Amino acid sequence: MNTQFNNKKTSQISWLAIDQEEKIKAKVLSLNRSDRIVELLFKIKAGYRSGPHRHTCETSVYVINGEIFNHSIKETFGQGDYCFQASNDTHDEEFTKNSLIYVNYKSKNDLFVEFLDEESNVLDTLTLQHFEEMMVAQSKEGSPKPPPPGV
């Protein structure tokens, strides 16, 4: 089997803060290295704004609860909404309510997200290795914080 699942029930996986302010927390549910597919839950506090970033992979998002405003397309997504972001979709999202979202990333390479400045220069990235490190951290007691950037 190519897919690795977290060795704990989802309810027992600790939320892992992935930004300095702890506005974004994640649980890696599964990771398939060969197909480069990652499934996660994100818990994001109201007021968080992603800034411009580009998904270099296909991304499916389902809003379990909360609300997201996509500044790039001027669209709000709320509880029960599904959103598909094609590979190389660049956008800027703001979480207007505390939100819980399910995300499925499917990439053609090890790069998933590029974080951009206002001139679209790449400032940081989110890679398969970051997700692997997150899964390892969440599989252990205490869940130490790994070094991935925000989402």
Task: Please report, for each region that a protein language model flagged, where it lies by residue.
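Residue-level recognition of well-ordered beta-strand positions that form the cores
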Residues: 41-43, 67, 104
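Glycine- and acidic-residue-biased ligand/ion/polar-headgroup-sensing regions
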Residues: 46, 55-71
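A short, N-terminal "cap"/entry segment at the start of jelly-roll beta-barrel domains
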Residues: 1-36, 122-151
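Short intrinsically disordered coil segments
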Residues: 57, 116-123
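Conserved short histidine dyad/triad with adjacent acidic residue
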Residues: 23, 28-30, 35-54, 86-88
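Short acidic-glycine-tyrosine-enriched beta hairpin
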Residues: 33, 69-95
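Ligand-binding loop in jelly-roll beta-barrel domains
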Residues: 87-115
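Short glycine/proline-enriched turns and hinge-like loops at secondary-structure junctions
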Residues: 36-37, 54-56, 75, 95-97
